[in-house]
Amino acid sequence: MNYTASNTSLWSLVIQAGLIAAFLLLANVLRRKVPFFKRSLMPTAVLAGFLFLILRTAGLFIFKAETLEKLPYNPFDTTILEMMTYHGIAIGFIALSLRVTKKDESAKGALTAPKSGALIVSTYLVQGLAGLVISLLLYYLFFRADSPVFAASGILLPMGYGQGPGQANNIGNSFEALGLNGGRSFGLAIAAAGYLCACIVGVIYINVLARRKKRERAAHEELSGSVVTVGDFQDENEIPIAESLDKFSVQFALVLLVYLITFLVSWGIDSLITGLAPGVAKTVSPLLWGFNFIIGTLMAMLTRKVLGVFRKTKAMTRQYQNNYLLSRISGLAFDLMIVCGIASINIEDLSGLWVPFALMAVAGGAVTFVWLRWLSKKIYPNYAEEAFVSMYGMMTGTISSGVMLLREIDPNFTTPAANNLLTGSAFAIVFGAPMLVLVGLAPQSLVKTWITLGLLVAYLALLLVFLLAVRKKKAAQEEPAADGNRE
């Protein structure tokens, strides 16, 4: 085997990974030492992605053009960045879904988790409506000469804001294949704008709360990392830390095994649909592979259930999953996904799309703010501010953005707001299933884009009835008790 620099297949990924690591470490130093970045609450991975993007786009790297020409490989290969973004979201969700869950007796009979899931999906729908209204208006007014797929490009707003760079990359890529020039970069740019929105709007809102004395911002000393205890690291009767196979190796092997199963299941479904209905396969296939993280999540949950059955029947005497290490794997995967997703944006691809991008970015932040502000007061009356801040951070960035904003006003997580993000996301997979169909329907034709708009409104109305009717029923049951207490 050729081990020299001329072997691009051997060294390209290593060079790219080294650059990503360098930007992550640089961003971490800036985040800790520079007051501006410290106060911004911008996640380190987001800052690293923007640094990578700015330097790559502006051509400010140390290498001269003639030096780059002499290299046998491109050290700034966007293809590898796209690949890592695609795999990162799937691996991250698989690792999260493999974690052993514990029954919460206090949550029995409560509807907070399903209502949180419905709130998350309803926000997707509101973002989708705002995006489609903008893209349809722009199409009829200015973009008639473009592909009709442009009219459906607004559906990328919830993919970028609500879902993050992983889904924005996957669905944007499928839109690009259908005729939307620069669709992948457009989706990723919206996701990047979502992070900025979470940081800027979120921090401003927290400062307003502090000035009005409604909440106090936590001191940065309170937000420092805590000590990890043995109880945090492992559960009872887990496999040893170091045996013939290292404990981390077991976790990584489980994740990769589930991802292999995910590939085989996706390939099997794709082959079956292609054999039975080739016409349908042209539409379904890109969506199937684009939403591979959902199939991965389902396969991981099934694997977790099978391992649980093995333990109950004593076929397996020890617990193989370690929640702490699986969380670290998912954290790494999501950090890589965020850095690579932002860094792989091709600014040139956005030429001609700056107006819709700007309108959707502003509209997305505004409608998400108003929608979540209204419903947080109704669904979480006892901790509305904490719930709103965390949900807004997640629905414009990722769950880490929501947690970082929440820690500024609830550093010890004394409210259930942080837990709602996790339990709500699980229910959002169920509530969000129709959304996947609509994402695939919208770009097929102009008529189907309008149908999608109508279906978004109808589904939003159903979720709103669920969210508010349940609350009204509960309030009606508690009202007599409250009257009795006053007597």
Where are these regions (language model features)?
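Transmembrane helical segments that form the transport core of multi-pass membrane transport proteins
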Residues: 258-379
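Interfacial helix-loop-helix linkers and transmembrane-helix boundary segments
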Residues: 34-41, 67-81, 99-119, 308-326, ...
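Juxtamembrane helix-boundary/capping and inter-helix hinge elements in multi-pass membrane proteins
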Residues: 36-39, 100-114, 139-151, 173-185, ...
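Intrinsically disordered, low-complexity non-transmembrane regions of multi-pass membrane transporters
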Residues: 1-10, 210-249, 274-283, 308-321, ...
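Alpha-helical membrane segments and immediately flanking helix-loop junctions
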Residues: 121-122, 134, 145-182, 205, ...
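Entry/N-cap segments of selected transmembrane alpha helices
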Residues: 102-134, 190, 250, 255, ...
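C-terminal transmembrane helix pair
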Residues: 336-348, 357, 361-471
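Hydrophobic transmembrane alpha-helices of secondary-active transporters
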Residues: 23, 50-55, 77-110, 298-309, ...
